[in-house]
Regions:
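Residues lining hydrophobic/aromatic ligand-binding pockets adjacent to catalytic sites
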Residues: 1-193
């Protein structure tokens, strides 16, 4: 299966990826299409003091990694990130604001902070590094692949009791699930399918 590179990919993207990671290839030789999830993500932002999943009112916020001017024939692998704006600071503040009340933000924040303090030249490299962190955090205790989600050595995942709130919309970043469910994120992905 061929998937595009993504900036903190969507829940749907990770469901496809985690179904069989060994069968996935990330497309980097295509002409770079503008206004896609290759350099943007959508996160959920609460309006009140509750966790975003418990909030009665929540909005989506799109975060875009600015890229240096790319022409229509430039390959995705050659697209460079622009640092003329303070987008890293803005993205980090948005992530903190959106997720600071979630159960797992304090545990996982330090894994993501370096991406907003250091510069990476190419978008593909930046996306790949974030993807590796996300997969490592999700797969820490879970063997993933071939449709089997097993926890530990001898027990199959049981997601029957997992209460998924109706707050995870189409196109929302996997971070919505990761910061809310932590190590149970793969179970939440199964339940959504």
């Amino acid at each position: 299966m061929i998937l595009p590179t993504t900036y903190m990919g969507s829940v749907e993207w990770y469901r496809l990826f985690l179904a069989d990671p060994s069968a996935v290839q990330i497309e980097v030789m295509e002409s770079f299409p503008k206004q896609t999830y290759r350099n943007r993500c959508t996160i959920t932002v609460p309006h009140d003091s509750q966790s975003y999943c418990q909030s009665s009112i929540a909005n989506s916020l799109t975060l875009t990694v600015p890229v240096k001017r790319a022409d229509s024939k430039q390959l995705t692998r050659d697209v460079e990130i622009s640092y003329q704006q303070r987008w890293q600071h803005q993205h980090w503040i948005a992530l903190v604001s959106a997720y600071k009340r979630t159960p797992y933000f304090d545990y996982y924040a330090d894994f993501f902070r370096p991406f907003y303090e250091q510069e990476t030249r190419f978008l593909v490299d930046f996306n790949e590094k974030i993807h590796e962190v996300i997969v490592r955090l999700m797969a820490n205790n879970v063997a993933i692949g071939n449709g089997l989600w097993a926890i530990g050595e001898n027990r199959t995942a049981d997601w029957q009791g997992l209460n998924l709130e109706p707050c995870f919309g189409i196109g929302q970043s996997i971070l919505d699930l990761l910061f809310e469910y932590g190590p149970e994120t793969p179970l939440a992905l199964c339940r959504m399918g």
